[in-house]
Design a protein with these regions (language model features):
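A short beta-strand segment in extracellular, disulfide-stabilized domains
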Residues: 50-62, 133-145
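Short, exposed coil/turn segments at beta-strand boundaries within extracellular/luminal domains
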Residues: 18-24, 101-107, 184-190
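Interdomain boundary/hinge segments at the C-termini of tandem beta-sandwich modules
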Residues: 27-33, 110-116, 193-199
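Short, solvent-exposed loop/linker segments at the N-terminal edge
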Residues: 44-53, 127-136, 210-212
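Proline-enriched interdomain boundary motifs that mark the N-terminal boundary
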Residues: 34-42, 117-125, 200-208
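Solvent-exposed segments in extracellular or luminal domains encompassing
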Residues: 1-10, 79-93, 162-176
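Solvent-exposed loop segments of extracellular immunoglobulin-like
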Residues: 61-71, 145-154
Length: 212
C-alpha cells in the first residue's frame, strides 16, 4: 500500500532467481490533498445606526472551488462565495469551501450580531387644563430608562424637551410627540399625548346700569 505525503515515483525491480535477470517498472503516485481557502469574513453588527440592510460576508471566488453556507437564513445566496447577510436575529454562518479537483474541504465561521431592539416610548395620559384643574399644567411622559435619550416636539409649553417626563402647560390644545432613542443601537420609538386647553371665560353681561 502506497500512502506518501508528497509526490513519489516508486520503482519495482523483479529478479528471476534462476537466471539472475531483472526487469524494472515505475509508478508515479501524485499527492493532491491541498485544501482550498475558506474565509467567511469579519464579524459585524446590524443595528439602526449601521448595516441596517445587512452587509457582505465571505471572500472572492476561486476557480475550481465550490462554496456553501449554513444556515442560509438571511443570505441572498447560500452557494456563492460572498453573499449579503441580513438575518433577523443573530446568526453564526459556516462557509464550506470544496476543491472540485480533489474533494478537500475547508471551513470558516462568521457571526452577524443583530441589535435592533427599540426602546419604550410612552408619552403618558392626556389631560385637560381649565380654570379649575391643572391650571399650571401637569406632568406628561414616563419614567426615565437608562441608556435612552428623549426628545419632545413641539417645545411650546414644556419646561424641558429632553427629559422623559416634562411638565406641559400650553396655552392652546397641543399634541406632543415623544421620541425615545436607544443610545446603544440608534433605534427609536415614538408616542403621542394630547393636552386639551379649555380656559375660555364665559360671557358675563349684567345689563345696563339703572338708577333707583
Amino acid at each position: 500500500i502506497a500512502n506518501p505525503t508528497s509526490n513519489q515515483t516508486y520503482t519495482l525491480t523483479a529478479t528471476d532467481n534462476s537466471s539472475g535477470c531483472t526487469a524494472t517498472d515505475q509508478v508515479v503516485v501524485t499527492v493532491n490533498i491541498t485544501p482550498p481557502v475558506a474565509e467567511a469574513g469579519n464579524n459585524f453588527t446590524i443595528d439602526c445606526n449601521q448595516n441596517s440592510t445587512g452587509a457582505g460576508i465571505g471572500m472572492s471566488a476561486v476557480n475550481g472551488v465550490t462554496y456553501s453556507w449554513s444556515p442560509t437564513t438571511g443570505l441572498t445566496n447560500g452557494s456563492i462565495s460572498n453573499p449579503n447577510a441580513a438575518p433577523a436575529s443573530t446568526q453564526t454562518y459556516t462557509l464550506t469551501a470544496t476543491n472540485s479537483l480533489n474533494g478537500c474541504v475547508a471551513t470558516d465561521n462568521v457571526t452577524v450580531t443583530v441589535n435592533t431592539t427599540a426602546p419604550t416610548a410612552n408619552a403618558g395620559t392626556g389631560f385637560t387644563k381649565n380654570c379649575t384643574s391643572n391650571t399650571s399644567g401637569s406632568q406628561i411622559g414616563m419614567a426615565t430608562a437608562s441608556g435612552v435619550n428623549y426628545a419632545w416636539s413641539p417645545s411650546t409649553g414644556l419646561n424641558s424637551t429632553t427629559v422623559s417626563n416634562p411638565t406641559a402647560n400650553p396655552s392652546v390644545t397641543t399634541t406632543y410627540t415623544l421620541t425615545a432613542t436607544n443610545q446603544s443601537n440608534g433605534c427609536t420609538a415614538s408616542s403621542l399625548v394630547v393636552v386639551n386647553v379649555d380656559t375660555q371665560a364665559p360671557l358675563a353681561n349684567a345689563g345696563p346700569d339703572v338708577e333707583i
